[in-house]
Amino acid sequence: MQPRTPLVLCVLLSQVLLLTSAEDLDCIPGFQQKVFHINQPAEFIEDQSILNLTFSDCKGNDKLRYEVSSPYFKVNSDGGLVALRNITAVGKTLFVHARTPHAEDMAELVIVGGKDIQGSLQDIFKFARTSPVPRQKRSIVVSPILIPENQRQPFPRDVGKVVDSDRPERSKFRLTGKGVDQEPKGIFRINENTGSVSVTRTLDREVIAVYQLFVETTDVNGKTLEGPVPLEVIVIDQNDNRPIFREGPYIGHVMEGSPTGTTVMRMTAFDADDPATDNALLRYNIRQQTPDKPSPNMFYIDPEKGDIVTVVSPALLDRETLENPKYELIIEAQDMAGLDVGLTGTATATIMIDDKNDHSPKFTKKEFQATVEEGAVGVIVNLTVEDKDDPTTGAWRAAYTIINGNPGQSFEIHTNPQTNEGMLSVVKPLGYEISAFHTLLIKVENEDPLVPDVSYGPSSTATVHITVLDVNEGPVFYPDPMMVTRQENISVGSVLLTVNATDPDSLQHQTIRYSVYKDPAGWLNINPINGTVDTTAVLDRESPFVDNSVYTALFLAIDSGNPPATGTGTLLITLEDVNDNAPFIYPTVAEVCDDAKNLSVVILGASDKDLHPNTDPFKFEIHKQAVPDKVWKISKINNTHALVSLLQNLNKANYNLPIMVTDSGKPPMTNITDLRVQVCSCRNSKVDSNAVGALRFSLPSLLLLSLFSLACL
């Protein structure tokens, strides 16, 4: 039998441990019984046990303290309630408050048959959380009242008592303050005769934790006799609030390859319960990790601080090998310091594994081929690369560079932002006859620098072979534009120049023919064989087809290819002016009053389509063969204007005065124009020719004067 004794002991010990564990799982902090009924004896005997109270904080009751609302009783460490001396009357109710660092609770002892005591209760509710207020010399005796929140019916229920040892007869107690006669009103009341304080409804510590009331005694007329004296009502916290995560969404980032123990983020929950108790003492844990690969425990959370840290090796934090670089953690916060009886709240923490540039881009091929027609520009080939880094970062985005084979800067390469490919383009047309083949060396790098232990290798460079295809190119005029200067009015058939166009396709030995492409005035002809350009009409500098003395024509050069190619050349003919336009005067109508004292008629201006020196100074004259002398006079004002005036008044009539104007060309050209002068009866009005300065008379004023003269017709 002896050999079996250790086995039996082990079995018994395991049963005890299992039972203890089960009890811990079912443990609820506080008094196991909240209300006790005690029959009032003839006398409570000193040190005699009255009843046993059972309190547990589910953590061993370390630093357990008991406090009784009556100074005549105490609770021993074993939970036994005893009297401190012989006493007969203790009132109708006692309260016992138990407290540890982890929990607290209050039990009510109802004295069946007890009577209200008349005497000093100076230490009622002595166990207030704050130090008792020093006793003052007064007859009203009050102590703080402690009331658990969330009490149930019945209400009202007595929670304390106020005593006035020197209270006059017929005096009354009066209670005031927030919770009595101030909002929220009617929570507390006092028996005006006995001083019993009662609560009328359930209290919520998270709404109001402490009520500051005042007690006073009054006479029958309501006049204050003593007081007011402060009365503090403290609401005892119950664990009735779950932890709440209020600051979401919670998103953290950690760089791939980070060392074990790297802090990612902090989770903080809030509990509305009393922070001085375990009701608001939180502990954190990770309930779930998604995905659960490569390890179901990629992260750890500090149970007290809420810091989330990595717990796997840096090799497992490789973004490129993870199925998903995003992890979601269900974080649970539990009050009561994490005991099973604690309330819980959860939140989701999203952790992103951020990329670092630990992979260099690599070309998918060492060599690429491209073809392009000579003369063409644009993209000729897309170079493809592979990069395992995050496509949304500069660790993936490629930057290409031509490092050899581009001395003429005929090529450029840019990155396609969608595909990350290198788009190689021709930006300067290539000539087959110059070079039919080109070889470029291209390198690729990332926008972001590589991490120190990674470098660009041979796969980060590639060769591009480009073949230039021969095409039938159009002939090219040289020079272009072609410029000649000739006098206008040269004789028809005059040779202006011989154009010259060459064929870039020098190896094909093609012939070239010429033709007129654009000749707005129809003045030119070109020999289709030798390119000689001559005139078919008189060249006129004043033609509307001439712009600023320059006439523009276009010619074609067409080769003999199949199909033929065409080139265009521009001819700019600068026409020199000759005096081929006579000047003209303005205005051609004037008026004057028949009784005018000022005999000035009009200021004449002259203009010429030719250029200087074939224009002004102009010479103004009256054609004397057509009009009598001693009636009209013309006087020069400046190079372009003259004043016409009368030598005597004329009768009302219309007069035609021939004006002869001559330019300064060699030979000069003359024009005779009739000036129509209207002599009017102006009544009280008159034309004031002096108002117009001889040198500053403007063309708009002359036109206005001409319009006014029409009124005399």
UniProtKB/Swiss-Prot annotation:
The keyword Ligase does not apply. The keyword Glycoprotein applies. A lipid is attached at N690 (GPI-anchor amidated asparagine). Residues 1-22 form the signal peptide. GO terms for cellular component: adherens junction; catenin complex; cytoplasm; side of membrane. SMART domains: CA, Cadherin_pro. Keywords: Calcium, Cell adhesion, Cell membrane, Cleavage on pair of basic residues, Cytoplasm, Glycoprotein, GPI-anchor, Lipoprotein, Membrane, Metal-binding, Repeat, Signal. InterPro entries: Cadherin, Cadherin-like_dom, Cadherin-like_sf, Cadherin_CS, Cadherin_pro_dom. It is a lipid-anchor; GPI-anchor. GO terms for molecular function: beta-catenin binding; cadherin binding; calcium ion binding. CDD domains: Cadherin_repeat (cd11304). Glycans are attached at N52, N86, N382, N489, N500, N530, N598, N638, N671. Residues 23-138, 691-713 form a propeptide. It is found in: Cell membrane; Cytoplasm. Residues 139-245, 246-363, 364-477, 478-585, 584-690 form the Cadherin domain. Pfam families: Cadherin, Cadherin_pro. One of its GO terms (biological process) is homophilic cell adhesion via plasma membrane adhesion molecules. PROSITE patterns: CADHERIN_1, CADHERIN_2. It comes from the Eukaryota. By contrast to classical cadherins, homodimerization in trans is not mediated by cadherin EC1 domain strand-swapping, but instead through a homophilic adhesive interface which joins two elongated EC1-EC2 domains through a region near their Ca2+-binding sites to form a tetrahedral, X-like shape. Cadherins are calcium-dependent cell adhesion proteins. They preferentially interact with themselves in a homophilic manner in connecting cells; cadherins may thus contribute to the sorting of heterogeneous cell types. May act as a negative regulator of neural cell growth. Three calcium ions are usually bound at the interface of each cadherin domain and rigidify the connections, imparting a strong curvature to the full-length ectodomain. This is Cadherin-13. The gene is CDH13.
